[in-house]
Amino acid sequence: MKKKIQFLFNKPQLSENIGMSIRSLGCFGFDEVGLVSPKKSWPNDKGIRASKHFELIAKKVKIFNSIPEAIAKSNIVVATSVRRRELSIPLINFEEFYKLKAKKITIIFGQENNGLSNKEISYANYILTIPTQKNKSLNLSHTAAIVAYMLSRSTKVLQETIVKNNLKSQDIEKFINYLMLLLENRQFTTIEAKTHNLELSLRSFLKTSNIDQK
C-alpha cells in the first residue's frame, strides 16, 4: 500500500521542513508527497538541499491550491493533530490504520505554527494523534518520520487487497456543495456561523459514515 498513501502538507512555512520531511518519508519507502499552498514556491534550493538523497521525490511533489483539490481522488483521509477536537470524527491509532483498505489514502499534516483548523480537519475520515508528554512540540519532519516509520514497520501495510471502495472525497464535496446551495436558495439560515457549523457537521457525518460507491 505504500504507493497508495499520499503525505499531504498543508500550508507549510519553511522549505527546510518540507525537504527534511521528504527525506524522512523517502527513508521509509514513501514517495507520494503533496503541498497545499506552501509559503515559498516549490521546488527551491533550500528544500531540495534538505531532502538530501531524495531529490527526485522532492522534484515531483504535487502542488495544490486547497485541501479539497488535493484529496479529490482519495477514498480515505486521515488528519494528524496533537489535541482532541470538538468534532464527531473518530480517532484512529496505528494498529487500526494498518487495517484500512482503500484505493487511495491521504494523510494531512498541518502547518508548523497552528496545525490544522477544525474546518481543515473536517475533510478527514479519521484523526491520528501521536502520544507525547506535556510539551507537544514535535517538528513537522519528526511527525512525518514517526508516521512513516509506524506505517512501514507493519507487513499489513503492504497488502494490496481492496475490501471496500469508499466514495472519493471529490464526490462527497460535490454533494455537500449541492446541498448547501439548495439550503441557501431556500433561505434555510442566513447566519454565517450557523451555515459554517452546518457544513462542518455534514462533512464530518459523511466522512465518518464510510459510504461506498454502491
Where are these regions (language model features)?
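Post-transcriptional modification and biogenesis factors for structured RNAs
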Residues: 1-214
